[in-house]
């Protein structure tokens, strides 16, 4: 599949191993995994950071290579069940942070046309995602602006 804002081809990734159950050496109780996921979320980690921490550090010293194989649920599903989900979806939050960072850079460096275009592309992606999430995970009346992004991220 092609990239969104360039004429280049997309990048190919390696495939995840086809496995129906977690490896034998990773035999941690589902409840312990879910408790650790909620604990990491309360510490302020995003769902992808939680997955990385479980892969690297694990639960009770045992690494968890794939949360969905071990529990039958995705990290975001576990967070929703325990009412610990973030206020904004992770992909939208990352794009908003990038847009705020680029806008601050553009205020200091108005002649940086390369990053001006990067900001425009990022804002386009944000508007597209807001339309996708509107009503469910984003307020129905939310529209993108720099001030709204700063407020949504809590950077005021």
UniProtKB/Swiss-Prot annotation:
Residues 1-67 are annotated as: Disordered. It comes from the Archaea. Gene3D superfamilies: 4.10.860.130, S15/NS1, RNA-binding. This is Small ribosomal subunit protein uS15. CDD domains: S15_NS1_EPRS_RNA-bind. SMART domains: Ribosomal_S13_N (SM01386), Ribosomal_S15 (SM01387). Belongs to the universal ribosomal protein uS15 family. GO terms for biological process: translation. Residues 21-32 have a biased composition (Acidic residues). Part of the 30S ribosomal subunit. GO terms for cellular component: cytosolic small ribosomal subunit. One of its GO terms (molecular function) is small ribosomal subunit rRNA binding. Residues 10-19 have a biased composition (Basic and acidic residues). Keywords: Ribonucleoprotein, Ribosomal protein. InterPro entries: Ribosomal_uS15, Ribosomal_uS15_arc_euk, Ribosomal_uS15_N, uS15_NS1_RNA-bd_sf. The gene is rps15. The lineage of its organism: Archaea, Methanobacteriati, Methanobacteriota, Stenosarchaea group, Halobacteria. NCBIfam families: PRK08561.1 (NF006331).
